[in-house]
Amino acid sequence: MKKYIAIALLAGAFFTSCGEYNRVLKSTDYEYKYEAAKSYFGKGQYTKASTILEELITILKGTEDAQESLYMLAMSYYNQGDYITASHYFTSYYNTYPNG
C-alpha cells in the first residue's frame, strides 16, 4: 500500500511541475515569464529556462532586465553543453554590453 501511495505522489508532483511549465509558456505576462525563467535557471533546469528566455530576449531588449536575460540564456546553453549556441549568445552579450 505504501508503495502505491509513493508512486501516486511522485506522479502527482511530476504532472504538477509539467502543468506549471506549460502555464508559463502559454502566459502573456512577460514579467511572470521572466521570473519563472530565473527560477528555472536557479534550479538548474536550463532547458526550460532557455526556452522561455529565447522568447523574452527580444521583448526585454532596452529594459533593465535585458542584460541579465541575455547572460542567463548564454549560460543556459553553456550548461546544456550546446557550446556553439552559447558562444553566439556570449558574443551577442559582449557586443551589446562591453562593460559587463
Enumerate the language-model features and the residues they cover:
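Bacterial signal peptide processing site
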Residues: 19-22
